[in-house]
Design a protein with these regions (language model features):
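Short beta-strand segments
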Residues: 6, 57-62, 98, 187-189, ...
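Alpha-helical scaffolding within the catalytic cores
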Residues: 41-49, 77-83, 107-109, 171-174, ...
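Mid-to-C-terminal alpha-helical segments outside catalytic/metal-binding sites
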Residues: 2-57, 234-239, 247-282
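Short aromatic-enriched loop/helix-cap "lid" or pocket-rim segments at secondary-structure transitions
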Residues: 15-20, 70-73, 108-110, 165-167, ...
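Active-site gating/metal-coordination segments in enzymes
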Residues: 56-57, 62, 66-155, 159-161, ...
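Conserved, mostly hydrophobic/aromatic
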Residues: 8, 50, 82, 114, ...
């Protein structure tokens, strides 16, 4: 059985799910609209579910999401909040540090603290509500720090389903970042839809750009993405994630089985690519 890494899973405890999807009215509306499971689980229950579905490792971000319409923070999770739910399972659960460019150098220093003191394995960016594109120079100090720390940055790329400007995450914007920071490992999440071909082109061109499949069910993946991840140039450039509660493990894994991927491509999609990019040891 192929091992699985979920490179992006939202905080899962009842307290943090409430903070994310009930306390904030906009995200609460999304949860109702999509019928999301937001009951939450204890860390012990979560690990039991991981074992049940063959999930070896999960990465959880300290989400930093700003409301574009209200100009207030929707999600502003803290390093310690995520560390407290992952600390007892250091080989199974890992943190990603959320980027808020408005924190300026305090934010850069907090990124370093999260990695060096709490063992976080990367950074995480959701730029849409801030109203600036991913290649805005205000993000460059954070990207430079990621290079210095040798950790990847995960960023949502493609449209935004919320009331936020989707153009902030056009895949072609990654060209600027990858050219300026050729050592920065970039995980472009959410398949880049509806600009999947544009994101594939960026991943094909740049050795340091990877594609993440979060928030889009495998049976709906763009046919060009499926072809890319199943061929020589794309094997090792695409990784699996759920963005739970948007997607869940059993449904996704069944749909991936139904794609009929080559064994090497399937192993890299589910485990190998994320293991390499985030340097996750067995």
């Amino acid at each position: 059985m192929t091992k699985v890494i979920d490179y992006w899973h939202q905080p899962f405890t009842p307290e943090l799910m409430k903070k994310a999807y009930i306390d904030d009215p906009e995200q609460g509306q999304v949860a109702k609209w999509w019928g999301l499971d937001i009951k939450g689980r204890t860390p012990e229950e979560f690990i039991a579910d991981m074992d049940k579905y063959g999930i070896d490792k999960v990465l959880i971000p300290t989400g930093k999401i700003k409301s574009y319409m209200r100009q207030v923070m929707q999600w502003d999770f803290k390093t310690e909040e995520i560390y407290n739910i992952i600390k007892d399972y250091p080989t199974r659960l890992y943190g990603l540090h959320g980027i808020n460019h408005e924190e300026r150098m305090d934010g850069v220093r907090e990124l370093e603290r999260a990695v060096k003191e709490f063992g976080f394995v990367g950074a995480h960016l959701h730029t849409y509500g801030f109203g600036i594109p991913v290649n805005d120079k205000r993000y460059f100090p954070f990207y430079a720090k990621c290079v210095e720390l040798d950790v990847p940055v995960v960023m949502q790329i493609g449209h935004s389903a919320e009331a936020m400007p989707s153009a902030m995450g056009r895949p072609i914007l990654l060209d600027d970042i990858a050219l300026f920071f050729p050592e920065l490992k970039i995980v472009a999440a959410h398949t880049g839809w509806p600009w999947c071909e544009e994101l594939i082109a960026m991943s094909w061109k740049h050795p340091n750009i990877y594609i993440g499949t979060t928030a889009h069910g495998p049976k709906y993946w763009d046919k060009n993405l499926v072809s890319y991840l199943n061929t020589r140039r794309g094997i090792g450039k695409v990784m699996f994630g759920t963005d739970f509660p948007v997607l869940n493990w059993p449904t996704c894994l069944k749909q991936i089985d139904d794609l009929g991927l080559r064994p090497e491509a399937k192993e890299q999609l589910l485990y190998g690519t994320a293991s390499k990019v985030f340097k996750l040891s067995d």
